[in-house]
Amino acid sequence: MDDLAWSIYEYLLDESTDFQGEHIVLLPIIVIARKFDRNHRTISRRLSALRDEGLIKTIIKKDYVALYHINDQEDND
């Protein structure tokens, strides 16, 4: 996992909403792509890396919008 993936994770955690003690976020990939000035394929690869590491979990995915559950690193320690 590289610095971009970690930055995306921190951004998703900052943008997330606390719902029943869990962090969730609903964002189109294009919003993340514009924030980091990258294309959607690059962002998709980083999101896949975050999923592989267990830092995020896709709850709902429809076209280019996804609802993610964000695992807080502090909760895992």
Predicted regions mapped to residue ranges:
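Short, cationic-aromatic polyanion-contact patches
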Residues: 28, 61-77
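The alpha-helix within a helix-turn-helix
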Residues: 33
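Short, hydrophobic-biased segments on the C-terminal half of alpha helices
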Residues: 44-48
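A short, conserved structural fragment
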Residues: 51-61
